[in-house]
């Protein structure tokens, strides 16, 4: 059986990250959406996205006529959903209890026909979905814990140098090849995951929940608070709190990053900081690119930053800022 993760029209709620890639590449917790599904299904899934992005993803299923299992990319996977999908027969669909589409087994290739399906061949199950870019920050701590449980069930943590201080070590996992010298890791309030060949320099202090991806670097005296996920090949420093760096991005110097999501291949120049609370402590509005209107989202929000964006040194970013892809920010 081939499994295909599908970007649905509601992908627009994930702007600016959905501008340059499929939702399957969005990171929350330890993994991207695709990595999480692939691990659960024990195979490499394919991606079905909008036309201008489809060329980025190999999709041999489009040239074939076999039955394919299509899966809503925003559905949060678990064993019960996996079992329900594997039990679908050709022509059957799986929905949540509110009628939201989760999966279908069909030879159809037109997404509209896939979503409609046969009204008499639909099964239901309880499911949760990722609904927007800002929702990623709200669920990151929960997803880190869920992913961490899978990691410790399938592997053993690396022993570390005695110069490090580990608080609640049973809640800390350090992957093969990681280097830690003179670091403080406090997992009392949530798990800490350190990926393969990651580097944590002297004096760094980290409180969970926290994820550091493969070959990522934490520089000296960095101060990191949960829930924070740092993707592969990132370099981080300064102070970071409750944020997600998707991967291949740098926030390497002093400055504050809080309640924010940074896309791939971004760079925050030295001294760059964002505000995450208004002086009035009042509600924050952030731009909704899809609806062309302002959404009120609570009293804490930093910035959403699209892929390939660069910040000059000493940039100061307003509360609730929405920055698109490939932007250059000065001041």
Model-derived regions, located:
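Terminal amphipathic alpha-helical/low-complexity segments used for targeting or macromolecular assembly
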Residues: 1-171, 177
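Structural signal for interior beta-strand "rungs" in well-ordered beta-sheet cores
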Residues: 159-331
